[in-house]
Amino acid sequence: MKKFEQLRGIVAPLDRANIDTDAIIPKQFLKSIKRSGFGQNLFDEWRYLDYGEPGKDAASRQLNPDFILNQSRYQGAKILVTRDNFGCGSSREHAPWALQDYGFAVIIAPSFADIFYNNCFKIGLLPIVLESPVVDRLIRDALTVDGYQLEINLEAQTVMALSGETYWFEVDHFRKHCLLNGLDEIGLTLQHADRIRKFEINRRNEQPWLFL
């Protein structure tokens, strides 16, 4: 998992509440357990005018010109700003995978579904909770200012607009540590590899009958 320290990037505003995981990545694309390849089907039913199927070349499909991510000004966006209860619905891990594979590194909303929120941290995707009036302002600015950007500082736990406005956000200390150091669950386990090996040796010596 990549370390997350600071990020400055274009903001894509998605002015909808209660976006569920089926909208983020429709069920027909959940057959793979690899984390890559889901980005082309992110928000599939909104991004395209035709029905998406696994294996269908996204380059040959008809884009919905009205959908925000299809507008040229938001190409390359790293930060998604959206509304309440983002990621609700079924607890599919593919939803944060699709967002990350598309290119998003940060999701900002007034609230998230709990399981989705937890799944984001597991892959290094940073979900940030800001108050609704602040999100209102960010969405408004992203809709009206071409190339609108934000700067995210995880160490300081701040979101800063280029105008200088700064907003502080909360993040669990342990999750912050993992993101700053690029540690997923496997990485955390490997940090204690020596202690694990020592435990196994002692256990084998003290309870040899378990290994007969």
Swiss-Prot record:
Q: Which UniProt keywords apply?
A: Amino-acid biosynthesis, Branched-chain amino acid biosynthesis, Leucine biosynthesis, Lyase
Give me any GO biological process, just one.
Answer: L-leucine biosynthetic process
Query: What is a single cellular component term in the Gene Ontology annotation?
Result: 3-isopropylmalate dehydratase complex
- UniProt cross-references to Gene3D superfamilies, sorted A to Z: Aconitase, domain 4
What Gene Ontology molecular-function terms does this entry list? 3-isopropylmalate dehydratase activity
Does the keyword field hold Amino-acid biosynthesis? Answer: yes
The EC code for this enzyme is 4.2.1.33
The UniProt record lists the keyword Membrane: no
| Pathway named in the protein's UniProt entry | Amino-acid biosynthesis; L-leucine biosynthesis; L-leucine from 3-methyl-2-oxobutanoate: step 2/4
Q: Which reaction does it catalyse?
A: (2R,3S)-3-isopropylmalate = (2S)-2-isopropylmalate
Xref: NCBIfam families: leuD, PRK01641.1
Quaternary structure per UniProt? Heterodimer of LeuC and LeuD.
Per the entry, what this protein does is: Catalyzes the isomerization between 2-isopropylmalate and 3-isopropylmalate, via the formation of 2-isopropylmaleate.
PANTHER family per UniProt: 3-ISOPROPYLMALATE DEHYDRATASE SMALL SUBUNIT, 3-ISOPROPYLMALATE DEHYDRATASE SMALL SUBUNIT 2-RELATED-RELATED
Sequence similarity: Belongs to the LeuD family. LeuD type 1 subfamily.
Q: What is this protein called?
A: 3-isopropylmalate dehydratase small subunit
Tell me the name of the encoding gene. leuD
